Structure formats: C-alpha cells, structure tokens
C-alpha cells in the first residue's frame, strides 16, 4: 500500500481556499505557539497513491527534479530511468504483461498518465497500476536498486498526475508541510501498513507480555489476511497471522488518559485493522470500551458534528469509505 497520510484538523478543506484564513487558523499569533497548545490530532490515511504519483512535479519538493536519487548498479542510470523489455509482468497475476514496448525502446521515464488528452484526464485517475503486495513491491525494489518498477509492477506504476487533476491535494500541500521524505511503513499492501499505523510495528515488539512465539502473537504481518490463521512461507514458516495479540497505540493512549476514537462508516473498505487484534475482538463480545472506540461505526458525519460542536477527542482516526479511499480504481478526492 503506497499511501498518503495527512495530519490536519477538520477545518482544513474549508480553509484551504484562503491562504490568510489558513494562516490565522494554525498560527493565530504570528509565531509558533508551541506543541503544548495543540489540543487535537487527526490521523487520516488514504490508499495506494505514491508521493511522486501525486506531487512529483510540484515546485520545491524532492520530486522528479531531485538530483540525489539512487543510481542503479544494473543500469548506471538514476531510478527515473526504468528498464523495459518483453519480459514485463502483470503485477496482479504475476504473468507476462501481454503487451510490449516498441522495438529498440529499452527504458521508460516517469510520464503524465493523461498524455493523450481529452477524457483521459478523468479515465487515468481510475486506472489500476499493478499491485502493492509484498512480492511484487520487493521485485520492483530489486534488492535496493529500485530498477524494476515497470518490469515487475507494470509501466503504469511510474505514471503521475498534474496539479489540475488533484487540486484539493495541491491546496493542502501548498498550505501545510508536505512530506516529500515520508515513506510507507513497509513495502507491501494495506493491512501491514495500517497495522503499523495503529501499533508502530508489524511484529510483536520486544518484551511483549504475550506468551508464545511470533506465530502465536500474529507477526510478522507482511500482507493482507482477513480470516483466522496464518500464511506460510515455502518452508512452512508462519506469517501474517490473525488474530494479532500485541499492544496498540490506542491502548497506550487510553492508559495515559488521552481520549481517542476511530470515526468510520460501516463501509470502511475493510481498512480498520483493529478488528485483527484479539483484545478488540474480545472487547466487541463484551461490548467493551476498546471496541466502542475502535471498531464500532459512529459514521463520518459524527466526526464533522463533533468537530463543529467542540467534542472531538484528543486523538481521532478517520477511516474512509471505499469510494473515497483514493484506492484505484476510485478517484482522488
């Protein structure tokens, strides 16, 4: 899951149209008021859009003009020169892609997805570019040389959009700090990245109070899995087990007396990973506090109502519904 994470407040979208309004909101005194004045943190994670895919052409960021990107030992060129050949894979099926570059073309550079014009500006925002699973992403990573994105995860994986295609995201990026050195927690799919988001790790941390080996505690979480049980390596070793049993960030917040809640609709695209933890499953059976705060469905409207009425907890997590997740084929917001 290549993701975009935005840390902001509920009023950002409304204020983004006016730079002066934004400046008054987050810095009302004209100086840095300090962390002690931050009363609410809102965490919002979206799906499957890379930084360069959105902001590679943005001025002032480490995008496509970055002179310090890695030079592959295999090509002796920087990673913006991606090799192509007749051996390209379909990232979803791991089968030959079925179409090939023109004769004598052996590399592909980042390109504007809607280069054909017309309705392609809308159509390409819905396009799927390979997959984000562990195997395909690490094949593209190629032991750190990062020179097999087009080969192992389709040529679409290095395409980008322009500001005109995603004006809301650009308004946010221009008004606030943009994380051009922000990376996903793990080069893999949704579940492990969201597990890391809610717990700080994809594997039981050292010193966990849960008895047993890693397979009993659930880790390491390397790919998506919804049902109880484990995936297995070729040698039979377990990974991506469900349920998980180590401690989550919300539990630490609660112990520290910090209020928190997950805001989501029943359509949450399966993106609330707290349901994977045993303690939340147990809490749900007992109608306990962990489940009420973390795995229930208060609805996104509840977030807007609480923001309006000054009732937000100190830490809010937002999980978007499927069609607003930005996960291809669903469009950017």
Regions found by a protein language model. Give the residues of each.
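N-terminal pro-sequences and low-complexity stem/linker regions of secreted or lumenal proteins
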Residues: 21-333
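Gram-negative bacterial Sec-dependent N-terminal signal peptides
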Residues: 1-18
């Amino acid at each position: 899951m290549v993701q975009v994470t935005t840390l902001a407040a509920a009023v950002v979208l409304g204020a983004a149209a006016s730079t002066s309004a934004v400046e008054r909101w987050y810095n009302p005194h004209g100086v840095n008021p300090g962390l002690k004045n931050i009363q609410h943190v809102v965490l919002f994670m979206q799906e499957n859009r890379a930084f360069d895919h959105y902001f590679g052409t943005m001025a002032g960021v480490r995008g496509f003009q970055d002179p310090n990107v890695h030079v592959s030992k295999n090509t002796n060129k920087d990673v913006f020169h991606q090799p192509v050949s007749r051996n390209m894979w379909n990232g979803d099926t791991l089968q030959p892609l079925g179409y090939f570059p023109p004769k004598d073309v052996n590399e592909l550079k980042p390109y504007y997805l809607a280069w054909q014009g017309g309705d392609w500006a809308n159509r390409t925002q819905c396009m799927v570019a390979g997959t984000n699973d562990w195997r395909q992403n690490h094949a593209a990573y190629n032991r750190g040389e990062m020179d097999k994105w087009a080969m192992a995860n389709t040529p679409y994986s290095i395409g980008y959009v322009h500001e005109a295609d995603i004006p809301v995201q650009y308004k946010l990026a221009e008004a606030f700090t943009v994380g051009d050195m922000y990376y996903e927690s793990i080069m893999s799919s949704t579940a492990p990245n969201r597990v890391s988001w809610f717990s700080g790790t994809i594997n039981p941390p050292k010193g966990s109070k849960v008895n047993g080996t890693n397979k009993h505690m659930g880790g390491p979480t390397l790919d998506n899995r919804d049902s109880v049980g484990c995936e297995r390596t070729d040698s039979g070793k377990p990974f991506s087990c469900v349920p998980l049993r180590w401690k989550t960030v919300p539990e630490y917040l609660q112990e520290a007396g910090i209020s928190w809640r997950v805001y989501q609709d029943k359509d949450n695209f399966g993106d609330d990973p707290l349901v994977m933890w045993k303690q939340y499953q147990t809490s749900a059976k007992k109608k306990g506090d962990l489940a009420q705060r973390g795995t229930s469905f208060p609805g996104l409207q509840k977030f807007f109502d609480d923001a309006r009425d000054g009732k937000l907890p100190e830490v809010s997590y937002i999980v978007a519904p499927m069609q607003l997740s930005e996960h291809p084929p669903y469009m950017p917001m």
